[in-house]
């Protein structure tokens, strides 16, 4: 077996889109039961890792508003140390591009990339299933980013089934508002009883982009007018525009990259707009088996 590397640079942490998001119930502990399709896209944060012999975990980049001890990346690394007894530490640098509170899984994806990269950097060779169980302790979306491919998700988001999705390029708009997820889920007006979906309702067909809805969207639009305005603007170009996660990002799929780019080029300057291609697999999927 080859020896573990001493550094891993340019490790991507891709964003996700929820192609639909249905709230189908609520557990006794208050967690909401969901059904969704997760789509990976090529809009990414980038992380760099250097192995340390002294066991320390050092975040070498500052993230405004996120102390190192509260950073999911550091928490993920600390959890991996605790679970394995690993004596190594790491210097960790993060190039942050994905907006926080955007509904695209930025923090969860960063944590998953940390688990995948440190699993290799520290020579731990933990299987994917073990990493996913650790990831669930950090957040409900983290297991998906460790799963390695697009998925139909159930439960609180941790019960995952692989799904093949049609190629698409997405226009993603961040209306530059931060949406705290608990604020949306705790709203009395939230729909919590959407009928259950079965995966055969959308076998790898274009229908998946038009299927269902995001049950969180109506609440977010009511609370954040900028989300409603961004959706109205994007619907000029696609009837499939919808919100991802609990917001604030909205998106629409396009068959052709040139078509998507033409729309992205017109996004009003007060918002952040970009094109992002759909991915079939996580870029670091090979880091675990």
Curated annotation (Swiss-Prot):
Its EC number is 2.7.1.148. Keywords: ATP-binding, Isoprene biosynthesis, Kinase, Nucleotide-binding, Transferase. Pathway: Isoprenoid biosynthesis; isopentenyl diphosphate biosynthesis via DXP pathway; isopentenyl diphosphate from 1-deoxy-D-xylulose 5-phosphate: step 3/6. The keyword Lipid metabolism does not apply. GO terms for biological process: isopentenyl diphosphate biosynthetic process, methylerythritol 4-phosphate pathway; terpenoid biosynthetic process. It comes from the Bacteria. It catalyses: 4-CDP-2-C-methyl-D-erythritol + ATP = 4-CDP-2-C-methyl-D-erythritol 2-phosphate + ADP + H(+). It is an enzyme of class 2 (transferase). GO terms for molecular function: 4-(cytidine 5'-diphospho)-2-C-methyl-D-erythritol kinase activity; ATP binding. The active site is at residues 16, 141. ATP binds at residues 99-109. Belongs to the GHMP kinase family. IspE subfamily. Catalyzes the phosphorylation of the position 2 hydroxy group of 4-diphosphocytidyl-2C-methyl-D-erythritol. This is 4-diphosphocytidyl-2-C-methyl-D-erythritol kinase. It comes from Ralstonia nicotianae (strain ATCC BAA-1114 / GMI1000) (Ralstonia solanacearum). The gene is ispE.
């Amino acid at each position: 077996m080859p020896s573990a590397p001493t550094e891993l640079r340019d490790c991507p942490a891709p964003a996700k889109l929820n192609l639909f998001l249905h709230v189908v119930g609520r557990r006794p502990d208050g967690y909401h039961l969901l059904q969704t399709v997760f789509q990976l896209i090529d809009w990414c944060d980038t992380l760099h890792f250097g192995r340390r012999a002294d066991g320390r975990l050092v975040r070498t980049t500052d993230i405004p508003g996120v102390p190192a001890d509260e950073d999911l990346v550091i928490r993920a690394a600390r959890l991996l140390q605790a679970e394995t007894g690993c004596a190594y530490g790491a210097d960790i640098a993060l190039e942050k591009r994905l907006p926080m509170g955007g509904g695209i899984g930025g923090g969860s994806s960063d944590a998953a990339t940390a688990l995948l990269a440190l699993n290799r950097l520290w020579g731990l060779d933990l299987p994917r299933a073990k990493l996913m169980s650790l990831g669930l302790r950090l957040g409900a979306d983290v297991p998906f980013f460790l799963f390695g491919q697009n998925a139909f998700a159930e439960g609180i988001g941790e019960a995952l089934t692989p799904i093949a999705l049609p190629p698409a390029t997405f226009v993603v708009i961040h209306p530059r508002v931060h949406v705290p997820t608990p604020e949306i889920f705790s709203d009395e007006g939230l729909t919590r009883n959407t009928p259950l979906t079965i995966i055969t309702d959308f076998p790898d067909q274009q229908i998946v982009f038009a299927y269902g809805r995001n049950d969180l969207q109506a609440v977010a639009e009511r609370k954040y007018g900028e989300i409603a305005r961004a959706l109205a603007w994007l619907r000029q170009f696609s009837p499939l525009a919808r919100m991802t996660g609990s917001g604030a990002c909205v998106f629409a799929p396009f068959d052709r990259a040139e078509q998507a780019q033409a729309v992205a080029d017109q996004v009003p300057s007060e918002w952040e707009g970009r094109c992002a291609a759909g991915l079939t697999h996580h870029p670091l999927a090979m880091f675990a088996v």
